[in-house]
């Protein structure tokens, strides 16, 4: 057995194999603080709402946090910011530990192999991912796993480009960061991140429209489409504007990095876009349109999107973990054959 874990700013997901099916478990990576009362804690426990009590406060954690925040008019708090553990949140480590324990569960055997997603250092910020990676490694090791980080962009390659010999450009549009990896036969040629993602879109939209950030997030995740037929001045119109701006920014940085890395011009590769921020209908077409106007020196033969972009990094992490387990003497097939419906704990 082996597992994959996507530790994202907005969502944490695990992937494991059950026969021919890949099973996903998901929780939102957030929490909200409410006042403690005996009655409130009893109701939360009876309703299976994930929570912990500390002194005179109760912290609702995971998927239910956003619902409670909207009901009580509060903002959710995040253990992570810009793709890594938040230095501004004192409760970051205990909260993310609780969520990870719920999502990944206990190992099926001692030192079970687990690959967890790791962002690349951003090229447009002085943020370092080292503390984040080592903290997660220690946390997962204490849980009984044998953890190994995998670059988030490379996980996309493992997940989506097996049919192209793991060759192509993977772009993971997350909440805190956008991760990019160009791989050739499963060997990374270029990998980096950009310190902008879905959170940046939400924050800019909230500021422009005077709407609470959590409300903007809810609208974006509900039925928002990138069709540009929304009323000017509304939240959806602002979301469309900042989505376009993010794509311009990402592609400009890809062009710059390709030039600096002196990537061979004769390459002809597919591009895969994944991540929760790429979920709105119309995203693939918009990205492809912006890519056509770029000066990237290699050829792009297609732009691929997938039906469930949120699960790509977790799935790729699982593929890598199972492949390494097999090379170490296991008998597992590194390619999951089917996907089960995601679970939420």
UniProtKB/Swiss-Prot annotation:
Disruption of the gene: reported phenotype: Essential, cannot be deleted. Low volactin protein abundance delays rod-to-disk shape transition.
Localisation per UniProt entry: Cytoplasm
Cellular compartments per GO CC: cytoplasm
UniProt keyword list: Cell shape, Cytoplasm
Bias kind Acidic residues: ranges: 334-345
Annotated region (Disordered), positions in chain: 318-345
SUPFAM superfamilies: Actin-like ATPase domain (SSF53067)
Assembly description: Assembles into dynamic filaments. Filaments assemble and disassemble independent of the division site.
Functional description taken from the UniProt entry: Actin homolog which is part of a cytoskeletal system involved in disk-shape formation. Could be an early molecular marker for the onset of transition from rods to disks. Volactin is highly abundant in disks.
Name of the protein in question: Volactin
Native source organism of the sequence: Haloferax volcanii (strain ATCC 29605 / DSM 3757 / JCM 8879 / NBRC 14742 / NCIMB 2012 / VKM B-1768 / DS2)
The gene coding this protein: volA
């Amino acid at each position: 057995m082996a597992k994959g874990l996507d530790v994202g700013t907005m969502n944490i997901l695990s992937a494991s194999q059950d026969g021919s099916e890949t099973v996903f478990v998901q929780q939102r990576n957030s929490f909200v603080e409410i006042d403690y009362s005996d009655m409130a804690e009893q109701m939360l426990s009876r309703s299976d709402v994930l929570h912990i009590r500390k002194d005179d406060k109760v912290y609702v954690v995971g998927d239910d946090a956003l619902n409670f925040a909207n009901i009580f008019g509060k903002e959710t708090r995040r253990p992570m910011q810009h793709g890594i553990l938040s230095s501004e949140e004192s409760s970051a480590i205990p909260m993310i530990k609780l969520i990870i324990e719920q999502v990944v569960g206990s190992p099926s055997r001692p030192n079970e192999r687990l690959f967890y997603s790791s962002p690349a250092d951003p090229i447009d910020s002085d943020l370092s991912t080292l503390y984040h990676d080592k903290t997660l490694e220690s946390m997962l090791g204490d849980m009984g796993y044998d953890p190994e980080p995998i670059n988030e962009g490379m996980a996309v390659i493992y997940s989506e480009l097996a049919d192209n010999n793991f060759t192509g450009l993977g772009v993971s549009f997350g909440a805190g960061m956008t991760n990019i990896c160009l791989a050739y036969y499963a060997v990374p040629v270029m990998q980096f991140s950009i310190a902008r993602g879905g959170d940046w879109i939400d924050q800019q939209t909230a500021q422009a429209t005077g709407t609470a950030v959590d409300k903007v997030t809810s609208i974006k995740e509900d039925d928002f489409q990138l069709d540009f037929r929304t009323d000017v001045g509304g939240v959806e119109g602002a979301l469309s504007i900042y989505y376009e701006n993010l794509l311009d920014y990402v592609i400009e940085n890809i062009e710059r990095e390709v030039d600096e890395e002196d990537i061979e011009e004769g390459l002809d590769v597919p591009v895969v876009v994944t991540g929760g921020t790429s979920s709105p209908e119309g995203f693939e077409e918009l990205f492809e349109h912006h890519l056509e106007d770029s000066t990237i020196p290699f050829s792009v033969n297609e732009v691929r999107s997938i039906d469930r972009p949120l699960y790509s990094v977790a799935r790729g992490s699982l593929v890598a973990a199972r492949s390494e387990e097999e090379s170490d003497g296991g008998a597992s097939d590194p390619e999951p054959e089917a996907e089960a419906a995601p679970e939420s704990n």
